[in-house]
Amino acid sequence: MRAAAPRRFLQLMRVGIVDGVPWWFRRRTPTGPQLFRGLLEKLGGSFVKLGQMLSLQPDLVPAPYCRALQDLLDRVPAFPFEEAAALIEVELGRPPSQLFDRIDQRPLATASVAQVHVAWIGGQKVAVKVQRPTAERDFGNDIRLVGRICWLIRRLRLRPLYWLLEPLGEFVAWTAEELDFRCEARYAEQLGDLAEGHAIQRVPRVHRRLTTRRVLVVDFLDGAVLLDYLRALEADPTGHAARALEPPGFDPDRFAANIVDNFLVDAFEHGIYHADLHPANLLMLDSSVVGYVDFGITGLLSRPARRQLMAMTLALVTGDMDLFHRCFRSLTAPDPRARPEVFRRGLDDLARHWYDPDSGALRVNFTRIMVDMLALSRRADFLPERDIVKYIRSSISIDGLIVRFAPQFDVGSYLAERCADLVRAERRRELLALPRLVEWVESSGRLLVDGPERFRRFVERNDAGSLEADRAALPPPSS
């Protein structure tokens, strides 16, 4: 197994030389982003997953590369059904013929981690995700290789490559969960429970008794994959090919709004959300309902963080930089190197570019603002907590995704509108919370007892003119 790591490194070098050197000297097509995507696809395995993770980090990766990596596909040949059946029997104790009414031997989809087969249980169509027999070995080798790359970057002080250290570290941590399908099942169940009350999203139900570390069985969601729709739009400017994929009742703007609504409700009301909104993980269902699959990357937000993020979004739209700065500061991780004064000055400079000097309206899109803000926070060593960065990156990814199929949809304005709704709903919930109700009942009881006497004293003071004196003693209202 250890001999495989050097072989993987040699493969990496070979692909880089064969594809990269001719491009470097000739400067011909494919472009840099296309070449990078092609390199990762040729390397396959965990490098495809790494590329997909990089596509979700536009504050670190240039926009053209993010767009190219969004369509990154795991081009891996299927492994024989006999191997899949053997693994199912090892994991579940019985062969597929005894677990399912029928199972398609030809996989519906293949990837470096697993492949998916369609099956039926009591007439119910399900998706059976079976881990590739060599996945743990292959990913283990790549993880060791990534660790050596990080060591070299630090050892040789390759400062231009320091930006890679964070996503590579996240990738290593994420891979351990990706290889244990029980983690994905747990996240899918949590998000599925939350989706029960929302008609605009669907999460497949997990079949727990048929789920193990290397096998995952969920209900089958029958819909068009958003990635296929995006490719059809880009390949045929007339839109005929894309319209052929649209389900009944599909409207691009409504679908975009539903993606944003689901993201905000999950993040701000429940504190857990799908953080890997790659177009291959989104399905277009009837009536613009959004279907979600692949829950390997999930974001979590505490209640205080949710409140600050909502307030920060509203402050951004209204141009209140003081409030924006206070909210952002409350979300940052303690760091002795932090220079908050540098961040504040930089924020004021950016605001002059973000807002129209006459009308005060925003004149740049949401993605530009978020990328600027994260870049500034890095320069000032004033970084938000990791969960906050993940949320911001997810919102940026949504903006970049939506513009590809609903270019007229203003994600920033809609985010602000929905945040305002959520803030009002949060205030109503707080008002009706048990401690507030108890406080209200107690104060109401005191008012019933003391009210008549207080009103009598108020009338006497008013007749005596003492209320005007009290008003004069108050400080003037601030302008």
Give residue ranges: language-model regions:
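Helix-rich C-lobe and terminal helical cap/extension of kinase-like folds
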Residues: 2, 28-31, 212, 221-223, ...
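Structured, non-catalytic alpha/beta "coupling" segments that mediate domain-domain communication
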Residues: 41-65, 147, 215, 408-412, ...
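Long, charged, glycine-rich C-terminal linkers/tails
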Residues: 96-108, 197-215, 279, 414
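Hydrophobic residue at the +6 position relative to the catalytic HRD Asp in the kinase catalytic loop
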Residues: 277-284
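ATP-dependent phospho-/nucleotidyl transfer catalytic cores
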Residues: 70-77, 89, 136-141, 149-273, ...
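Short, amphipathic alpha-helical segments that act as regulatory/interfacial helices
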Residues: 44-48, 147-150, 189-192, 392-402
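N-terminal accessory/targeting segments that precede structured cores
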Residues: 1-115, 119-122, 126, 137-172
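Conserved beta3-strand ATP-binding lysine motif
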Residues: 129-131
